[in-house]
A protein has these predicted regions:
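Hydrophobic alpha-helical segments, chiefly the membrane-spanning helices
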Residues: 1-364
Length: 364
């Protein structure tokens, strides 16, 4: 979309309304108003998501690629990490598998749902789309390494029984995750920034339009954080209602984590979808794969610190079914994104894997 020199009123008001709804809920308005207040919370949630996407576009257009996509990925992940850590500290040892479930859901949603939808949307509108193969290959290699080391390898170590690392192993893997993600960010933003830039031939008014003023970009950055914070907290507040609905429908509780992860990732997902529709697939893939890398590369070290500080055993290893789906997703992503050209075929394959993931979660 074209970035204006001033912000529309709805993008400024939406996060304020979201935080007012949160304050009202804390003061007991939900008990007074009843079910209607839940509908207001849902409306506030989606308004916050749309506002976050808009402000992210403003910031991204100001700082340019690939910094703009990195801003949104790190901002969402930082708030996601804070939410997971706070839930772990509040829930105690019973929540030691929360980080694993959240990270795995995020990786599967991004690698199959988000990427698949972007490839399908872009391919259906523009036919064949192209992107920089070197940047995407670097993203996939880093993601595969971190995902296998953190979610699969714990099942096969022998120092500690169960799907967990020992204290020394956990500390080592946390450092390894930070090294891999830090190196990726260095390559993306400094050493080989050109690998992640959109093709110069792309003709889009948003790419060539003048960037917004610095003051407007700083305001949007602050409002972006406010939007993301409101989205995460509203999702957390709606979780009990959502869980009751899922249980009432006879579905497994694991579906709740998938739905919450989807809501938290909506700002990045919508931004990536819009970029793919505008024939900027490089930007779309930067958003999607960068989000997955930030999610797993920053969350695991953070929860490892909590685990080491509290003495809780952190469950990281996923089960056999999840391992098969994760490996399938990585292999398919490597093949479908390995040529630098995509069509609706690749998008359909990713979405089918995502559908299988959802179905086997509901019907294990």
């Amino acid at each position: 979309m074209k970035i204006p020199t001033s912000l529309p009123l709805w993008s400024v008001v939406s996060p304020i309304v979201a935080w007012l709804l949160l304050a009202g809920s804390a003061l007991g308005m939900g008990e007074v108003v009843g079910g209607f207040y839940t509908l207001l919370l849902v409306a506030g949630l989606f308004a916050g998501v749309l506002a976050a996407v808009f402000h992210a576009e403003v910031v991204a257009h100001r700082v340019g690629e690939p910094y703009g996509t990195l801003v949104l990925a790190v901002a969402v992940t930082a708030i996601e990490v804070a939410l997971i850590v706070s839930l772990m500290l509040a829930g105690g040892a019973e929540t030691t598998g929360l980080a694993r479930d959240t990270v795995f859901a995020a990786v599967m949603i991004i690698l199959n749902g988000m990427v698949g939808l972007c490839l399908l949307a872009g391919g259906s509108r523009h036919g064949e789309q192209t992107f920089g193969q070197y940047g995407v290959s670097a993203s996939l290699a880093t993601l595969a390494a971190i995902a296998i080391l953190t979610l699969v390898l714990p099942n096969y170590t022998t120092t500690t029984p169960g799907p967990a690392y020992s204290s020394s192993q956990l500390a080592f893997i946390a450092v390894v995750s930070l090294v891999l993600y830090g190196t990726f960010v260095l390559v993306q933003t400094v050493r080989h920034r050109d690998y992640f830039l959109p093709e110069a031939s792309v003709s889009d008014e948003e790419v060539h339009a003048a960037p917004p003023p610095t003051r407007l970009a700083w305001f949007s950055a602050a409002w972006l954080l406010a939007c993301l914070g409101g989205v995460v907290l509203l999702a957390k507040m709606l979780a009990p209602t959502l869980e009751a609905a899922v249980v009432g429908a006879g579905a497994p509780k694991a579906l709740v984590g998938i739905i919450i992860a989807t809501v938290v990732l909506l700002p990045e997902g919508i931004a990536a979808y819009q970029a793919a529709r505008a024939n900027r697939l490089q930007t779309s893939l930067n958003l999607a794969l960068g989000s997955a890398l930030a999610s797993i590369g920053l969350t695991i070290p953070a929860v490892a610190i909590v685990s080491l500080a509290t003495g809780w055993t952190l469950s990281l290893g996923i089960d056999i079914k999840s391992t098969v789906l994760l490996l399938l997703s990585i292999i398919v992503a490597t093949l479908s994104l390995g040529t630098g050209r995509t069509t609706v075929m690749q998008g359909t394959v990713h979405l089918v894997i995502f559908a299988v993931y959802l179905f086997t979660t509901i019907v294990p």
